[in-house]
Swiss-Prot record:
SUPFAM superfamilies: Ribosome-binding factor A, RbfA (SSF89919). The keyword Cytoplasm applies. It is found in: Cytoplasm. One of several proteins that assist in the late maturation steps of the functional core of the 30S ribosomal subunit. Associates with free 30S ribosomal subunits (but not with 30S subunits that are part of 70S ribosomes or polysomes). Required for efficient processing of 16S rRNA. May interact with the 5'-terminal helix region of 16S rRNA. GO terms for biological process: maturation of SSU-rRNA. This is Ribosome-binding factor A. Residues 119-132 have a biased composition (Low complexity). HAMAP family: RbfA. InterPro entries: KH_dom-like_a/b, RbfA, RbfA_dom_sf, Ribosome-bd_factorA_CS. Keywords: Cytoplasm, Ribosome biogenesis. It comes from the Bacteria. GO terms for molecular function: ribosomal small subunit binding. It comes from Anaeromyxobacter dehalogenans (strain 2CP-1 / ATCC BAA-258).
């Protein structure tokens, strides 16, 4: 049996179990934002687990929730290891995943651009120096 994919399999199981625990909720009052586990990586020796999280809410909610997650890391490590029946408990490290927030921002900017494009006519643009006028370009 090959074991070269084991870290990837354990990382996926780790992500799934951690998501379930977070869905049930933690008692830390700082964790008020909606937390999504977007990915996880496991070191080849299964001693380190890097978990990527996205937190929905304003900047303060994100910071407070992230601090709460880091404070709860030991508890979460034990709970996930117990559920997965791992021999060794991987050290859990959270990393804030900005890709979801970045995607939301891009989507909002595109929506605003479309709204502005419909509201205001496109400005007249003069051709660049040396460019052919439109009627000559069609010939």
């Amino acid at each position: 049996m090959t074991t070269h994919n084991r870290p990837a399999r354990v990382a996926e199981e780790f992500r799934h179990e951690l998501s379930a625990i977070l869905a049930r909720g933690l008692k830390d009052p700082r964790i008020t934002g909606f937390v999504t586990v977007t990915g996880s990586k496991m070191s080849p020796d299964l001693k380190e687990a890097t978990v990527y999280v996205s937190i929905h809410g304003d900047e303060r909610v994100r910071k407070d929730t992230f601090a709460g997650l880091q404070a709860a890391a030991g508890f979460l490590q034990r709970e996930v290891s117990r559920a997965l029946r791992l021999r060794n408990t991987p050290h859990l490290r959270f990393v804030y995943d900005e890709s979801v927030a970045r995607g939301d921002r891009i989507e909002r900017l595109l929506r605003e651009a479309r709204t502005q494009g419909q509201a205001a006519p496109a400005p007249d643009v003069e051709p660049a120096p040396g460019a052919a006028p439109d009627d000559e370009a069609e010939e």
